[in-house]
């Protein structure tokens, strides 16, 4: 579907304007969040996996669960019915729940209900007339996958000589410098203790989440990893 917005409008967070179908607000600070799960391992050994796409407010606060009437279930069926089976196939490889926490479907339902329903540009009133129910969620999942494909965190780290290891330790600044050399912006790194397990890539948006232009920006704050002694552990098939 097309939003009809184009990509020449104002960048999100550039003004205090109210949210519209073509200007994302108040959640104009957008995070593409990725997991690195090693215990239990999820996803390919040479790729991070998708956590979600979150609309933070420009000051770093955020809203959640913005429209319970659109808490869709059966995301697989929704995607398949609306011609997005390629997106679904990719999600089944790269957007995976921790098996201890539930099914992939449950993670997708949670990410849409908790975060997806909060985008001003994904309100049902923004959809082309005659759009099927859930079309805005399909557009959300398609965009998350599209954006994730532009953020090959594993490849970027290994390009800079940083590889998963159970013994090597890194400083926060060395990891972010390596990623900045590849991506041009600095992400936020989160850890479980001192083990790197999540990364946040930040954007402002011009236009709609459906088909707008995501402009990468550096993280406005650091993640919770320590300043040194960080390990990027390998995925060891510890299932």
UniProtKB/Swiss-Prot annotation:
<feature type="disulfide bond">
    <location>
        <begin position="191"/>
        <end position="225"/>
    </location>
</feature>
<feature type="active site">
    <location>
        <position position="115"/>
    </location>
</feature>
<dbReference type="GO" id="GO:0033897">
    <property type="term" value="F:ribonuclease T2 activity"/>
</dbReference>
<dbReference type="InterPro" id="IPR033697">
    <property type="entry name" value="Ribonuclease_T2_eukaryotic"/>
</dbReference>
<feature type="disulfide bond">
    <location>
        <begin position="21"/>
        <end position="126"/>
    </location>
</feature>
<comment type="function">
    <text>This is a base non-specific and adenylic acid preferential ribonuclease.</text>
</comment>
<keyword id="KW-0540">Nuclease</keyword>
<dbReference type="GO" id="GO:0003723">
    <property type="term" value="F:RNA binding"/>
</dbReference>
<comment type="similarity">
    <text>Belongs to the RNase T2 family.</text>
</comment>
<keyword id="KW-1015">Disulfide bond</keyword>
<protein>
    <recommendedName>
        <fullName>Ribonuclease Le2</fullName>
        <ecNumber>4.6.1.19</ecNumber>
    </recommendedName>
</protein>
<dbReference type="GO" id="GO:0005576">
    <property type="term" value="C:extracellular region"/>
</dbReference>
<feature type="disulfide bond">
    <location>
        <begin position="13"/>
        <end position="58"/>
    </location>
</feature>
<feature type="active site">
    <location>
        <position position="51"/>
    </location>
</feature>
<dbReference type="InterPro" id="IPR033130">
    <property type="entry name" value="RNase_T2_His_AS_2"/>
</dbReference>
<keyword id="KW-0378">Hydrolase</keyword>
<dbReference type="GO" id="GO:0006401">
    <property type="term" value="P:RNA catabolic process"/>
</dbReference>
<keyword id="KW-0255">Endonuclease</keyword>
<keyword id="KW-0456">Lyase</keyword>
<dbReference type="InterPro" id="IPR036430">
    <property type="entry name" value="RNase_T2-like_sf"/>
</dbReference>
<feature type="disulfide bond">
    <location>
        <begin position="66"/>
        <end position="118"/>
    </location>
</feature>
<dbReference type="InterPro" id="IPR018188">
    <property type="entry name" value="RNase_T2_His_AS_1"/>
</dbReference>
<dbReference type="Pfam" id="PF00445">
    <property type="entry name" value="Ribonuclease_T2"/>
</dbReference>
<feature type="active site">
    <location>
        <position position="111"/>
    </location>
</feature>
<feature type="disulfide bond">
    <location>
        <begin position="5"/>
        <end position="22"/>
    </location>
</feature>
<dbReference type="InterPro" id="IPR001568">
    <property type="entry name" value="RNase_T2-like"/>
</dbReference>
């Amino acid at each position: 579907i097309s939003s009809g917005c184009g990509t020449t409008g104002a960048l999100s967070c550039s003004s205090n304007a109210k949210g519209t179908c073509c200007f994302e607000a108040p959640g104009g600070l957008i995070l593409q969040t990725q997991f690195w799960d090693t215990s239990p391992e999820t996803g390919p050994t040479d790729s991070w996996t998708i956590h979600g796409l979150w609309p933070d407010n420009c000051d770093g606060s955020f809203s959640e669960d913005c429209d319970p009437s659109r808490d869709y279930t059966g995301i697989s069926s929704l995607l398949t019915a609306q011609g997005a089976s390629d997106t679904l196939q990719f999600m089944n490889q790269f957007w995976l729940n921790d098996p201890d926490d539930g099914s992939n479907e449950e993670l997708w339902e949670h990410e849409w209900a908790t975060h997806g329903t909060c985008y001003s540009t994904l309100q049902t009133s923004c959809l082309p007339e005659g759009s099927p129910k859930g079309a805005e969620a399909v557009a959300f999942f398609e965009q998350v996958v599209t954006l994730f494909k532009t953020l090959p965190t594993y490849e970027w780290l290994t390009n800079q000589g940083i590889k998963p290891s159970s013994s090597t330790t890194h400083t926060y600044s060395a990891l972010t410098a390596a990623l900045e050399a590849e991506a041009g912006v600095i992400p936020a790194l989160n850890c479980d203790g001192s083990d790197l397990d999540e990364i946040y890539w930040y954007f402002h948006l011009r236009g709609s989440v459906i088909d707008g232009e995501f402009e990468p920006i550096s993280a406005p704050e650091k993640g919770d990893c320590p300043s040194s002694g960080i390990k990027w552990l390998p995925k060891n098939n510890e299932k």
